[in-house]
Amino acid sequence: MRETVKLIEVARELPVSRKNLQMLLLLLLCGAAAYIINLADPALEPLFLALVFGIVAGNLQRDEEKKRVVERYVPFLLPIGITLYGVNINIPYLGEFHPEIVAATLISTSLIFLTVFWLSSRLKLSRQMSILLACGSGICGVSAIAIISPLIKPRKEEFSAAIMIITAVGLTGAILYPSIAHYASISPDEFAVLAGATLHQTGIVKISSQLFGVEEEALAIKGIRIAMIALVVLILSIIYSESRFYVPWYIVSFLGVALFSSTYLPGEVVQALRPLATVMFATTLAAICYTVNVGRVQRVGVKPLFASYAGWAVGVAFVLLLLGSGAL
């Protein structure tokens, strides 16, 4: 209740003028454009596109007053965007899967997460950057990074770099997986397991698996990993809370929306709400990245890229080993 009142107070304090409304419209256009492009090419994650649009717009205009205005809108947009994005999280019923597939997916996800986090730590990346890369690699790509970032509070350049890196690794997978499937002689059903258990973004899983006619199977397996974001968010919110056992209200509402939309809302209602949720969250990312300096993003270096690729390679090797041994 207290934080709801606080959000209302933030909304009341937002600067309202013709110029500021034009800025808000620009951010909304960034989010809408990202969503529309994703409809044409699902491999291009709308949150990633919104990030790029926000960075480009901010660095082209170089108006410090506008950046200050945008920064004041972010605390209002972020909790709403995260809450609504819960409709994009489908919590699957694990009884629909073979136990060995569930186990393999959970183990490979954990293996990727731990490998990326360990390597990032060894390479002396910040704890926040390590968590962003680990969650993005192991769970659900850009979405995971965007959802957990308010909890761990990384630097803006780390946030932007993590999204770009995870997108690059995912696109690499989309290019290489057909060749891997050919040389490893795996069946379409086995490819669904490989794609669903190791690829980063949902759109890339969809495109890759369409080539083998196993789109639904691969997306269902990917859904197991996506559902893990609920547990990770809950754990991180407790670890990083300023008060003991405190979970931010927008995290609770995000989890509630995800659970409600997965179990009670009719499928057609969920499908109708997802565009709104995606555009809203994409708009929020455009606002966050509007104030990002490109030069600082470049200074992040190649170490995060190495850690992410290495963790992904370990996950792929593990799943291929299981498939080759006949365990799946």
UniProtKB/Swiss-Prot annotation:
Keywords: Cell membrane, Membrane, Transmembrane, Transmembrane helix. InterPro entries: UPF0324_pro (IPR018383), UPF0324_YeiH-like (IPR004630). It holds the Pfam family Cons_hypoth698. One of its GO terms (cellular component) is plasma membrane. The chain crosses the membrane at residues 21-39, 43-60, 73-95, 101-123, 130-152, 162-184, 191-213, 223-240, 245-267, 271-293, 305-327. It comes from the Archaea. It is found in: Cell membrane. Belongs to the UPF0324 family. This is UPF0324 membrane protein AF_1621. The lineage of its organism: Archaea, Methanobacteriati, Methanobacteriota, Archaeoglobi, Archaeoglobales.
